[in-house]
Amino acid sequence: MKSTNWWKYLLAVLVVGASGVIFMGFSTYKDAPPKPDYISPSGVEIVQRAAVERGQLVFQKYALMEYGSMFGDGAARGPDFTAEALHRIAVEMNDYYGRQVTNNNLDELSQIEKDGISIRVKRELKANRYDGERNIVVLTEGQAYAAERLVEYYSSKFKGDH
């Protein structure tokens, strides 16, 4: 079993492997999710794309991808910021719509009204409001309110006021 052409097979494997890596690298950037601006229904900018990109740099700098849950095992490695943010958004949206119904007295809400508000919040959170042509997401009034409260919450939390 004397083979003098082993290098041809090695070269073929290296070319195929390198081609795969190059293809995956290209696909990663080509198929990356959009980074839109987030605006209120009245057109006020809530979150700009540049702010999302700055946040992404902080996320990477402090390796925050190492925190939170993975495979449903809970927040064993640290706080799950995504779950916390989503929960706070839902709570703030419920609060916003509840105050609209009762003129700021949430104790007046009946269970049926609370259930209706909860359904509305779930529907709004699941709706895709992305406009690909303008690269924007138009938030609902409740989402815009919750986004502002979320910024206040995390600003306070990370500055030590919370």
Positions of PLM-derived features:
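Post-cleavage N-terminal segment of exported redox proteins
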Residues: 1-48
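Soluble extramembrane regions of membrane proteins in the secretory/endomembrane system
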Residues: 31-162
